[in-house]
């Protein structure tokens, strides 16, 4: 199975260790993983600010880079949701449709495609709060949101249960947005910060040592809020935990 690895802009710039952990984790399962070196943005910032047509060049490059792979995998529900649902600034050829359909977020790829049953190398003896990032939760179906009042499931929590020593703590409002929202945090900084403070306070109240999520952007926002509040929480991407990160 030939995998194309897409690394989001903010991971490449601020948390390259998340991209490395994703690569290493996929290779643990015997997959052939390649990183196209001329990859850039998925186009989400332009789409989110109402300048969707300006994303055409980045969309075309994305398709060019990844059309030859069996699957495209990225450690970001936000970027994958953009590709699946909003990569529409370019003509929808069969090639474009195929790339959109085979683009997966890391957790769903491990859970739904590889159907991982065990992670024998993974051990993380800590109390963990899991943050369900909005686009992964409601956009690509990571889990069933509690507001639907239907039987619950969670792909990331199913995977975290396979990590030795890891204990998941219960949050008061587990599905609530952290306030980042990409450009939302720029246009509505006060609201964004307040939402982040509420999230961090809930995590601390639950007794978490670490906060785990499948999206680095949410983690970076919450980490900043925790530092501003003086709350000693630590934040780590799920790719690192599943890959056997030593805390």
Region spans (language model):
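Iron-sulfur cluster-binding electron-transfer modules in prokaryotic oxidoreductases
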Residues: 1-247
């Amino acid at each position: 199975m030939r995998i194309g690895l897409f690394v989001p802009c903010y991971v490449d710039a601020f948390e390259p260790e998340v991209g490395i952990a994703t690569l290493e984790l996929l290779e643990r399962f015997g997959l052939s993983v390649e990183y196209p070196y001329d990859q850039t943005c998925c186009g989400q910032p332009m789409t989110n600010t109402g300048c969707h047509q300006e994303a055409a060049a980045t969309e075309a490059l994305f398709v060019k880079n990844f059309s030859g792979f069996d699957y495209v995998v990225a450690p970001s529900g936000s970027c994958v949701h953009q590709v699946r649902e909003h990569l529409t600034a370019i003509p929808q050829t069969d090639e474009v449709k195929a790339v959109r359909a085979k683009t997966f977020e890391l957790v769903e790829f491990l859970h739904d495609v590889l159907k991982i049953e065990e992670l024998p190398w993974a051990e993380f003896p800590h109390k963990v709060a899991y943050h369900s990032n909005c686009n992964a939760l409601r956009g690509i179906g990571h889990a069933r949101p509690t507001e639907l009042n239907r039987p619950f499931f969670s792909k990331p929590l199913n995977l975290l249960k396979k990590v030795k020593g890891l204990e998941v703590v219960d949050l008061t409002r587990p599905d609530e947005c952290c306030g980042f929202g990409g450009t939302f945090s720029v246009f509505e900084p006060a609201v964004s910060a307040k939402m982040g403070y509420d999230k961090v306070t809930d995590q601390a109240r639950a007794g978490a040592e670490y906060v785990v999520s499948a999206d680095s952007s949410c983690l970076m926002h919450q980490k900043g809020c925790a530092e501003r509040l003086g709350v000693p929480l630590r934040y780590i991407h799920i790719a690192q935990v599943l890959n056997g990160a030593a805390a």
